[in-house]
Design a protein with these regions (language model features):
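Residue-level signal for alpha-helical context at structural boundaries
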Residues: 88-89, 108
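Extracytoplasmic/secreted envelope proteins and their assembly/folding machinery
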Residues: 37-41, 68, 91, 95
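Phosphopantetheinylated carrier protein domains
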Residues: 76-78
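Acidic, Ser/Thr/Pro/Gly-enriched interdomain connector segments
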Residues: 2-61, 100-109
Length: 109
């Protein structure tokens, strides 16, 4: 018995573009700090080079009002619920757009 048919085969890829840094498992909001905040701040600043409506922020690892405002602008541009909080959908979209604008996936072989 062949559930998928007899011509089924598995193909593999070396690397598929994706999330440069994994979601930390919790939302980032005002008062959050550490590496995940630095990641978001750096990625938002890079995205802002292509989307100037997103304000740049100081990369200090502290999620303050400026980071929240940058996140709100990003969410608005990319049709996400505008909360200023980096939840999983926002993290994933920031990562996806970052990969696109920084072109880090282009030369992977």
């Amino acid at each position: 018995h062949y559930y998928y048919g007899s011509d089924m085969y598995v193909n593999e890829a070396e690397i598929v573009s994706g999330i440069p840094s994994s979601y930390p498992g919790y939302d980032l909001t005002i008062g959050s700090s550490g590496e995940p905040v630095i990641t978001i701040q750096e990625q938002l600043n890079r995205i802002a080079q292509n989307y100037p409506a997103i304000p740049t922020v100081t990369v200090d690892g502290i999620y303050g009002s400026a980071t929240a405002e940058s996140v709100r602008a990003f969410q608005s541009i990319f049709n996400l619920p505008v909360s200023g909080i980096v939840d999983f959908p926002t993290w994933y979209k920031i990562s996806q757009i970052y990969v696109g604008v920084s072109k880090i996936g282009e030369n992977i072989r």
